[in-house]
Structure formats: C-alpha cells, structure tokens
From Swiss-Prot:
HAMAP family: Glu_Q_tRNA_synth. It comes from Xanthomonas oryzae pv. oryzae (strain KACC10331 / KXO85). Zn(2+) binds at C101, C103, C118. It comes from the Bacteria. This is Glutamyl-Q tRNA(Asp) synthetase. The gene is gluQ. Residues 279-299 are annotated as: Disordered. ATP binds at K229.
Amino acid sequence: MPSPSYLGRFAPSPTGPLHFGSLLAAFGSWLLARHAGGQWCVRIEDIDPPRAEPGASERQLRTLTAFGLHSDLPVIRQSERDAAYTAAINRLLETGQAFECSCSRADLAGMGGIHHACVAPLGARRAVRLRVPPQSPVGFDDALHGRVLQDVYADVGDVVLRRADGYWAYQLAVVVDDAAQGITDVVRGADLLDSTPRQMLLQRALGVPQPRYLHLPLMLDGDGRKLSKSHGAPALDDTDPLPALHAAWAGLGQRPDALPRRATVTTLLQQAVRHFSPQLLPRQRQRDRATCAYERQRD
C-alpha cells in the first residue's frame, strides 16, 4: 500500500442514514485531505450488529456519492476484519498487555464504572481489556484544540477491547484499521476527543504509528444536543445536495461568499478546495447558524 504524506478517512457506523452532523465530519475531513494534497477514504464501522440498520451502509455510500465525496481507496468494512482484530488481541494477551475479565457494569458501578482490578471471578462470558497501569497520563496536540491531557488510568481504567458478548470494541477496531490503512490524519467530531488518549495507549501497545488528530466542533440541535439519529436528526437529501453543502461550509467557519450559489456539485467542490482555510475552523460546539440555515432550506 502506498504511504502518502496525508491520508484521511471518514468512518460512519451503519446505524441509519447520514445527517447534517455526519456531513460536517465527512466534508471537513475531505476538505482537509484535499487542502494537504492528500488522499481520503471511507471505512464502514459495522462491528456492532445489534445497532446496525439493514441497508444503511449502502445508503450512506450512495449519499456520499451524491454529495461528490468519493473514496480514493476501496471502501473497508470492519465486519470483514475479524482476523486482524483477533491477531491484535492474541498479541496483547501473549505479552500480558491485555487480560480476560468477567466484570459486568453492575460489578463496577461502585467504582464509577472504572476498572482497575477484577472484582468478579472469571466466568463463561469474558471480555478482553487493555491493561492500563497507574499514572498513565497521555497528552497530544490536537490540530484545532491544542494540548489535550488525560490520565487514562484515573479517568477510564482498563479499556475494553473485546466485549463479553464477543463483539469487537470500537477502540480496538479503529486503532487496528487506522494502522492497517496507513491513516496519517484522523479528523472527526469532538465527541471522540476523550477517546484519543486510550487509542494512543493501544497504539503504543501494538507498536503502530500515531496519526495526527483534529476534532471538529459538533453541530447541536435546538435543545443543545448533538445532532444524531437517536435525537431525530433528519436524513440528508440525496436529490438536492447543494443546500446542505453550503450549510456545512458555513458550519466549518468558511466564508459563505466563496462558493457559487448555483453550480454543479463538482464545481462547488472544486471551489471549496480552492478557497478552504483550516485557520477558519471553529473550536466551539454550538447551535450554529449553519444548522439553522440548513433547516430553513429544508422547510
């Protein structure tokens, strides 16, 4: 696989159609990749079958195509990556960096859900956790938010890598796949900012490279909640991408007058790449004017 100086990605979970918040992350990561002269790819994070919606991943890919956001590399599906995750787990178990655990959430409730030592005997249902030693501060420089520091031992505890029901945990799958694909830059929503330190610990344990990180501000609904399917965020309209693209451009802090009001999707994206400025990206999550504008255009 080639090793570009910049390879970004958009990695949706197939729990429903893409919405405006999804577009902000996809468009933002795509623009940053194009601005850097790099590549951008799509990965379907379908490791949680109980939450997956039938046909959702295909619809998500159709939406990205309608919005002109094409993956430069073949689309990867995490549901087809069991062998890679198993190999990573076995390696960590063999080196003592991971261990089996039968502690349930109820068992850990008295510790605030944070696992520092097993309190339940091993049973038939066993998770696998990354062993996090005491005093495990992890710091990194986010390209938008600056220095971020977290004591993973105190704040998170031993990290689940494989759930007791046998499904892979997000933290393991994302680290293994970012490394396998050669992802150099992770651009995603700020709701995943506090997941980054535990992913960095896992990267160190596996001996894989650490990407650069940039966490975009979240788009909030009228009640101040993150736009999401669970909170009723409407699906993007594949038949009319321009209003949502204009609104997402504004949500990324860019100058609205830089893009033509009437254009093909291809022309609009060409102009977006030409005029995009990372220095204008906002840092604060908010009920953004872009969200309001997009909703007005839909009404």
